[in-house]
């Protein structure tokens, strides 16, 4: 399935400021600078989500209408160390409200950097998703920066860690080489 049409339809800075929950939603979550916006732009086949080399650029929840059928939802990155405690609390409130109020949220796509093991904030995100009983998949980003053996080793580490959360699908992805793109699209747009 291809993404033929996409548009940013809503940017939410506060809880409840979302579009009507009438379309299937897929949320994208991950640490700051893990490549959420880059992944979305690769899926969209154009630069619609703003990318930056500075972590913490996405500070709102952005709703993209895809093929007039689905919302792809870009969540703020978590774990950005230089954000103020007040801003971190606001982001936490925004994401918790989103998870707890969106009955049409069918899947969370958690992005993790393939070069590093899971971090404390990744575990917190997994606990949130578990608490809300939301299905999820894991996308390992930046796989082009690892050798084949290094990637294989990291996938094994992630598989072992994720057994505690029901062994979700793990998709190795690279925006540069487009590795994993077709596999991901099959899951996101059934």
From Swiss-Prot:
**GO biological process, any:** division septum assembly
Identify the Gene3D superfamilies for this entry: P-loop containing nucleotide triphosphate hydrolases
Q: Name one Pfam family in it.
A: MMR_HSR1
What Gene Ontology terms describe what this protein does at the molecular function level? GTP binding; metal ion binding
One cellular-component annotation, GO = cytosol
Q: Where is the signal peptide?
A: none
Cofactors named for this entry: Mg(2+)
Residue positions annotated to bind GTP are: 30-37, 56-60, 74-77, 141-144, 173-175
- Write out the entry's keywords from A to Z: Cell cycle, Cell division, GTP-binding, Magnesium, Metal-binding, Nucleotide-binding, Septation
Coiled-coil residue spans: none
Task: Give binding positions for Mg(2+).
Answer: 37, 58
Q: Where is the EngB-type G domain?
A: 22-190
* Recorded superkingdom: Bacteria
Q: Which family does it belong to?
A: Belongs to the TRAFAC class TrmE-Era-EngA-EngB-Septin-like GTPase superfamily. EngB GTPase family.
* Function as written in the Swiss-Prot or TrEMBL entry: Necessary for normal cell division and for the maintenance of normal septation.
* PANTHER family in the record: ENGB-TYPE G DOMAIN-CONTAINING PROTEIN, MSS1/TRME-RELATED GTP-BINDING PROTEIN
Protein name (Swiss-Prot/TrEMBL): Probable GTP-binding protein EngB
This chain's source organism reads Kosmotoga olearia (strain ATCC BAA-1733 / DSM 21960 / TBF 19.5.1)
């Amino acid at each position: 399935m291809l993404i033929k049409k996409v548009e940013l339809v809503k940017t939410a800075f506060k809880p409840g400021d979302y579009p009507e929950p009438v379309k299937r939603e897929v949320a994208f979550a991950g640490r700051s600078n893990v490549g959420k916006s880059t992944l979305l732009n690769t899926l969209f086949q154009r630069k619609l989500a703003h990318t930056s080399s500075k972590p913490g650029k996405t500070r709102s929840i952005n709703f993209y209408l895809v093929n007039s059928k689905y919302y792809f939802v870009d969540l703020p990155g978590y774990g950005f160390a230089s954000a103020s405690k007040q801003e971190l609390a606001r982001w936490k409130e925004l994401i918790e409200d989103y998870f707890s109020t969106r009955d049409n949220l069918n899947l969370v796509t958690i992005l993790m950097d393939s070069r590093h093991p899971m971090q404390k904030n990744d575990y917190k995100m997994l606990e949130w998703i578990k608490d809300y009983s939301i299905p999820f998949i894991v996308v390992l980003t930046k796989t082009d920066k690892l050798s084949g053996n290094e990637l294989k080793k990291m996938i094994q580490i992630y598989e072992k860690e994720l057994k505690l959360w029901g062994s979700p699908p793990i998709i190795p992805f690279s925006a540069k080489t487009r590795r994993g793109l077709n596999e991901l699209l099959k899951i996101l747009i059934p």
